Amino acid sequence: MNFRNKYVLAIDQGTTSSRAILFNHQGTIITLAQKPFQQYFPKPGWVEHDPNEIWYTQSSVIKEAMAKADVTDSHIACIGIANQRETTIIWDRETGFPVYNAIVWQDRRTADYCEELKSQGWAERILQKTGLVIDAYFSATKIKWILDNVKGIRERAERGELCFGTVDTWLVWKLTRGAQFITDVTNASRTMLFNIRTLQWDQELLDLFTIPASMLPQVKACSEVYCETSTPIFKKGIPVSGMAGDQQAALFGQLCVEDGMIKTTYGTGCFMILNTGKEPVLSQNNLLTTIAWKLGDQTTYALEGSVFVGGAVVQWLRDGIGLIPNASITEQMAKSVSDNGGVYFVPALTGLGAPYWDQYARGAIIGITRGTTAAHLTRAALEGICYQVYDVLMAMENDIHAKPKEIRVDGGAIANNFLMQFQSDICRCPVVRPNVLETTALGAAYLAGLAIGYWKDIDELKEQWCLDKVFNPQMKEDTARKLLNEWHKAVGRSQNWAE
């Protein structure tokens, strides 16, 4: 097929914004369009989105990206989707109307129910089947909450009238006007309902959470032609041929395609993923075992550490307490002081993720004196992101009994040179920043393009990976060790805080 003058459209549906990016055959960004959407916090610990607003903003940026590039449908070879994971949407199979707001991955309303499951002895069984720890983070308890708490919904679900999907499923449903009800293995692996060994929905877990199997989408590989669009956005059908959760898409976009390669994404949260190859490695250190991707019949597995609050702590400094006017000033502020002034910021604003998994931890700023300035607080917030990533890296090293050669990084925050240098200093490891920062979208584009032959194979993709900068450790090792000791003291103070 002739792909001359054709582009791949990547849909990158994130936690705070919807984006659409057009890539050319060299993996270069042609245009990018982005639109934020409303975050809803109905109660403390609750986080919701409006599914219709997700679709409205996503369809809007698709049109904007195409208009910016002055391209028509005939210039789009295929579409790839990357999405925020775990976020749970339930809608009516006939009308397509959501029955409740999307419950976002950060939402903690089911924390007490998760504790009940642990006390009933389900932790090991769920770990063996799904690779996951029991936590409100994943979709299963969110689905159950909607079925149990929204009037009339359980009865409708049992009559087969409702669909559940993560955001990828919702987008494909909308792109095909309800003709396709599918997900991919990476998104399925984050529901706590999917058996990562059999690659099937697990009936025992469906029974545990009292979720009717009829609600669940068909599970597909990450790179295959699923369908063609049938939405007014496009005048003709365009193949939808790649799909993965955002962190797995970023791992693929970074071309961490060999065992032992590792990447960290700095977004709303921070997510470190290590490619473990063809076999799942069950963590002994509170990490998640997940599916990296499935190409054809071959499934690749990964270890993941999820940090709930990464870049969101900077958002909180700006919007929550008005300490900074914008995110870009944080690098300058952090560098304006020689150290953190003894201040440690544990950004457990929605609990602590890996490796602590403390749903009742809360944010803490410790070590404040009369000499503490806004610059110290800002620096402590950035350092807090890096310390959390360090804790995940140590858990990974203990699981695989090896140190990574380097950490590839992506996400909006990696433009912050202070953050990247401090990360290298603390981890005692090179931090590698690529030329293309939009690796989540690039991964979705690669998966879609491979399925239709736009790119021949992974070797062709490897030739496109391009380095921007390597950050090597500069801090003395004993200084790093002292900082980490203080950090771990601060974490201890923040744990088990909420009732």
UniProtKB/Swiss-Prot annotation:
UniProt-listed CDD domains: FGGY_EcGK_like
Listed SUPFAM superfamilies: Actin-like ATPase domain (SSF53067)
Binding site for glycerol: R85, E86, Y137, D246, Q247
Keywords assigned: ATP-binding, Glycerol metabolism, Kinase, Nucleotide-binding, Transferase
Any single GO BP term: glycerol catabolic process
GO cellular component: cytosol
Catalytic reaction(s) noted: glycerol + ATP = sn-glycerol 3-phosphate + ADP + H(+)
Binding site for ATP: T15, T16, S17, T268, G311, Q315, G412
Documented EC number(s): 2.7.1.30
Enzyme class (EC, first level): transferase
Molecular function (Gene Ontology), one example: ATP binding
Keyword Protein transport: no
Residues that, per the record, bind sn-glycerol 3-phosphate: T15, R85, E86, Y137, D246
Activity regulation field: Inhibited by fructose 1,6-bisphosphate (FBP).
Family annotation (InterPro entries): ATPase_NBD, Carb_kinase_FGGY, Carb_kinase_FGGY_CS, FGGY_C, FGGY_N, Glycerol_kin
Functional note: Key enzyme in the regulation of glycerol uptake and metabolism. Catalyzes the phosphorylation of glycerol to yield sn-glycerol 3-phosphate.
Name this polypeptide is given: Glycerol kinase
